[in-house]
Amino acid sequence: MTRWALRTATTSYQVRLAPDGAWAELAYWGPAVEETLVPGPLEYAGPTPYSTAADVAACEYAPFGVRHFAQLDLIAEREGGVRGTLWRHSGDDLADKDGTTELRLRFADASQRLTATLCYRVSRDHDVVERWAEITNEADTPLRLERSRSAAFTMPTPGGARLHYLHGRWAQEFQTGQVELRHGRFTLENRLGVTGLAHSPWLAVQPLDEPDGPTWSTALAWSGSWAIDADADSAEGVTRVSLGRLPVEAAIELAPGETFTSPPACGLYSPDGLAGAARAWHAYQRGLRRDVTLPVVYNSWFATEFRVRADEQIQLARKAAAIGVETFVVDDGWFVGRDDDRGGLGDWEPDPAKFPGGFDRFVAQVRELGLGFGLWVEPEGVSPRSRLYAEHPDWVYQVPGRPMTTIRNQYVLNLGRADAAAWAHAALDRLLSRYDISYLKWDMNRPMTERGAGADLDGRHVANYYAILEALRRDHPGVVVEGCAAGGGRADLATVARCDVLWPSDNTGPLDRLVVQHGFLQAFAPHLMSSWVTDDPGFFATSPRSRDFRYVTAMAGVLGIGADISAWDQERLDEAARWISLYRSVRDVVQLGEVHRHGDPRGPFYAVEYARDDTVVLLSWRTGHARGSATHVSRPPRVRPRGVDPAARYRRRDDDSRHSGAALAAAGLAPLPDDTTDASVVILDRV
């Protein structure tokens, strides 16, 4: 039986061909092995009564016609023709270059005139297996793809599976959830046209009886509508996860000779539970990042909202520079017609009434303070009262003759149109070329409705979103791009590959934010997690917490300040300067270090540890009860750092004490020594 063995940094992924060449199946996925004929846990004896071999095999990609009853990844049909596909293996290629291996398995259906290529890519730099499918219409008539997933991954789960997922809503993103699945299907779907707030395109699978052991995790690199199905069969001892796009408006139709390329579905294995899977995702995402320093940002939204005035913004910028902020960002409200959320979107020109001395002069004043300068934009948003809509009403999504839905008082630009996409790119390129801008925050504040007619509307919109981001990064490499969608509504691996940092949630209340960040770090690396210190009391601040608590929470990723610092006295400004200086001294460790989470933020104590090179940073919080003050206990909580070297010695910066790594790992330390402290930063340097 033909078999291909793929190696990642620490794992093996082995694929073999069915005896008749009708499908590829997973033979082994786990810790790295040298053998290519591993008797893996996915072996099967053959079909059971009332099934076929394909329906019980660990099929890597199953079309209807090869499979009949079990989970499917492809459903293709021609008008007036046969619905289904019966293909055979027609060739393969295996290439290895610079530590990256790519496998391409080709299948062909001569009767339906369809070819498919199952694609795999792995690297010795990380443990992620990237997979995608290419479906080509070889006939002279259209081919409809009712379902066209990216890939499927099969995991051994004797006795059933424990599925971990991320769910939420606006201001409550990245909540962790789990479900036990012994039989049947668990589905996550998103039909919004953007990645979504309700669920993340991410899933982790564990055997029910091994919660801290072998863990498989999958994620979809797609920023539109998507679906993930997990089918478990405890009798068979397997769980199969199928991921891919979800064509909401209509099936995807391929013209003669056209090829559909699915977005990548990514999977990884870790022997170390959810924590190990999180670290594996972080390592992969660090490989996607550009070599840029993510600045400490001040964003003026909470200080002024839509009431943007140049003189007030400069006063904020002066104070921001004095406390050590590195980039000043003007959020919503800087452009013409934008005095509230009912106008202006689409007219991306500075409002001369708000910048009477000229926008060039305003930007220069900010830069003269030693600050970078940034702007908020929402390129896909169109206000009904905007000049853009008046001139191009056909550029927004709509169904002729039907009412148009406004959400947040705005429409959505049909980015799938070549002319609209070219206009959006030109508008952004003009801003970045004309003004000395080093930071761009790309927001998207509503889902898609009334998309109308047309081929693959979701695919065309997302493809042009990617193309614009790629062009901006190519032509303006010095600009840091932050991704945002009403908070964390566009957090996915495809956006991660094209943005430098993400905004996880509009909720900056410290207790809520800790929960959001805890879930975010399960799927995404800390260098992607923008987090601000905002005023208390604030809109989301429902429980009393110290200012230290807020700073330590924001230090857990990419620190920013979003408070109205014009109202701060000198004591508060000096306090902010100390925290920012401390963060900048350990920024590389926090953003790029190996992460270990201790406890759960919904409990009385929580800590996050970052280890890189010779430094360990431990952030700790006495979270207390959800609606009350910190819990009073007689013994302070202790943390045993996991990132220390037992053979080394460490100096604790705050008190200059020395400890062996072995003692720290065994006995731990007390980062919050008394009830008067609800948050702390402990830094350990190897000596």
Regions found by a protein language model. Name each.
Residues 1-5, 9, 13, 24-231, ...:
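Polysaccharide-binding surfaces and accessory modules of carbohydrate-active proteins
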Residues 53-55, 63-86, 207, 211-226, ...:
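Glycine-rich, aromatic-flanked loop segments that form ligand/cofactor-binding clefts
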Residues 84, 252-270, 679-684:
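Short Pro-Gly-centered flexible turn/kink motifs
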Residues 293-426, 439:
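Aromatic-lined carbohydrate-binding/catalytic grooves of carbohydrate-active enzymes
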Residues 356-358, 390-392, 396-548, 558, ...:
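Active-site neighborhood of glycoside hydrolase catalytic domains
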